[in-house]
């Protein structure tokens, strides 16, 4: 992550906070930091603000590209940063892609993290405070070198 990316990310987090939301690093970036590994990609999840407001904020700090319309996922042109709203997923058919997606910026950390595969990938880190949210015990699993899925049913739906 370069200095320009760090500046954009901080602006996003500050603006989200001003509007009543919170921006978190999620998934692999947090896992890799906890494990002492180099960061490969940057994934951010913004809680507590609507999609319309998020789009406005992204336009203030860069050129947003919406590439996962059903998933509420954006990127900023020229930057390797993915920004998403929290969502839940429910299996709706037999196929690998048969899921009902519900974007909901207000579902909370635990429910948003529930859709992830393993506890170590369900970590969130508040961008402004540095506080790590660990609703499923991922840091302890990393420490103990355990790979544990979060939810039997969801893991069986998309192994």
Feature map (PLM): residue ranges:
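Catalytic cores of the polymerase beta-like nucleotidyltransferase superfamily
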Residues: 1-159
């Amino acid at each position: 992550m370069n200095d320009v990316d760090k500046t954009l990310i901080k602006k996003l987090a500050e603006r989200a906070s001003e509007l009543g939301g919170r921006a978190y690093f999620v998934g692999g970036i947090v896992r890799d930091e906890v494990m002492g590994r180099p960061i490969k990609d940057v994934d951010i999840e913004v809680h507590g603000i609507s999609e319309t407001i998020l789009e406005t904020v992204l336009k203030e700090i860069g050129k947003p590209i919406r590439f996962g319309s059903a998933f509420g996922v954006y990127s900023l042109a020229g930057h390797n940063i993915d920004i998403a709203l929290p969502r839940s997923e429910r299996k709706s058919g037999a196929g690998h892609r048969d899921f009902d997606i519900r974007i909901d910026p207000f579902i909370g950390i635990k429910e948003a993290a529930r859709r992830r595969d393993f506890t170590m990938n369900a970590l969130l880190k508040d961008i402004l405070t540095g506080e790590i949210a660990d609703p499923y015990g991922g840091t302890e699993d990393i420490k103990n070198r355990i790979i544990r899925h979060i939810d039997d049913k969801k893991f069986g739906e998309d192994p």
